[in-house]
């Protein structure tokens, strides 16, 4: 998708599907049949059948109770086995959608398409949505068509697609697995919401900072403030310069409250706290992902993003990653497929690259402060030239 949006001037679109009471509509007989088709023996099937059957529920309103009703479908939520059975039930959906770009996490199903022609993208999404709806209906599940969402990237037009019987208009941003995905794919919308949330926490710390000992203030910093930026950093790290500046400002404000120090420069506060900026932490995370790719510890979709250099000059074969040809800043330079090889090839200490285990690697870069970062956030402004690289 990034390649299509970067150099080829293509388009991308996605339909975010919403299932009505997904966990509560699982057909028990069909689930048992699917488990049998996957090779579960009779004893295992009997255990699962016993686990699901003879469940009853009733409703309490104030002091009144309804009559008991038997649960004839659905898997128990809040259990370890419930989500596993749900995933098994949904597993064969991908056989029906074998020629479709689909991502699924529990009951969140997203169809996506990319092409040089906008109409091709829209047509694929509509056709694939129909295929998905047919599978849901055949498996006793119901798609809440009115609550589906549609996103595009690469066009300024306000578009719509038909999902079943519903006409779904394009959204500017939608939440997917905790991330607010926007039309421009820069995640500024997500970070604005996140920064507002973290600012409220910092303000709460400011009100009680003077009555708390240092250790308590630092615990609040680590657990309630800094942790907010630890979710999906590889997704939002390619944000705008202004947004990165805002994140640093929040971090600095929090550190000053913890240390009750309002004069020391931000860089020195970081040293005192033995911590890094969030941008540098994100670079650490990129380095960890590249190590995992190199040592075959990553899932297939991550390994497909990168490729090793063949017999690179001056290095041992396979020690460096090939950089892709990119054409734009927004969709090319600001991407993991471009930045990952840069971090591994040019920024990471050679000693760290020689580590043999992931734990050893994490330990070796714990105190590493990334220097000469080539990303847009770390360039210097030159009058008349704009932002330029400090090095090749």
Language-model segment annotations:
Residues 1-2, 50-68, 194-196, 328-339:
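Reverse-transcriptase-like RNA-dependent polymerase core
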Residues 127, 142-174:
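Short, conserved micro-motifs composed of acidic
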């Amino acid at each position: 998708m990034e390649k299509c949006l970067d150099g080829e001037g293509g388009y991308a679109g996605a339909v975010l599907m919403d299932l009505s009471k997904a966990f509560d509509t699982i057909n028990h007989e069909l689930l048992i049949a699917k488990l049998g088709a996957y090779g579960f023996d009779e004893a295992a099937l009997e255990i699962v059948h016993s686990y699901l059957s003879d469940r009853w529920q009733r409703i309490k309103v104030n002091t009144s109770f309804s009559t008991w009703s038997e649960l004839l479908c659905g898997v128990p939520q809040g259990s370890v086995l419930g989500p596993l059975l749900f995933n098994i039930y949904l597993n064969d959906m991908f056989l029906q959608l074998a020629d479709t770009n689909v991502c699924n996490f529990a009951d969140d199903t997203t169809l996506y398409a990319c092409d040089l022609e906008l109409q091709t993208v829209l047509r694929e999404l509509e056709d694939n949505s129909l295929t998905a709806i047919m599978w849901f209906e055949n498996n006793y599940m119901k798609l809440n068509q009115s609550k589906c969402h549609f996103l595009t990237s690469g066009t300024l037009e306000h578009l719509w697609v038909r999902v079943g019987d519903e006409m779904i208009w394009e959204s500017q941003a939608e939440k997917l697995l905790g991330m607010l995905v926007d039309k421009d794919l820069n995640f500024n919308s997500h970070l604005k919401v996140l920064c507002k949330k973290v600012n409220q926490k910092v303000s709460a710390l400011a009100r009680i900072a003077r009555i708390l000992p240092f250790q308590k203030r630092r615990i609040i910093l680590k657990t309630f403030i800094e942790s907010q930026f630890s979710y999906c950093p590889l997704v939002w790290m390619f944000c705008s310069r202004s947004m990165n500046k805002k994140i640093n400002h929040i971090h600095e404000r929090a550190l000053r409250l913890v240390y009750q120090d309002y004069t020391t420069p931000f860089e020195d506060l970081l040293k005192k706290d033995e911590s890094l900026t969030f941008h540098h932490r994100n670079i650490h995370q990129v380095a960890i992902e590249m190590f995992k790719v190199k040592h075959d510890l990553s899932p297939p979709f991550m390994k497909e993003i990168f490729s090793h250099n063949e017999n690179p000059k001056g290095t041992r074969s396979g020690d460096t990653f090939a950089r892709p040809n990119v054409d734009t800043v927004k969709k090319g330079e600001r991407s993991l497929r471009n930045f990952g090889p840069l971090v591994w090839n040019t920024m990471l200490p050679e000693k760290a690259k020689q580590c043999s285990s992931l734990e050893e690697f994490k330990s070796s870069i714990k105190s590493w402060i990334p220097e000469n970062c080539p990303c847009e956030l770390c360039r210097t402004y030159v009058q008349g030239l704009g932002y330029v690289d400090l090095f090749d």
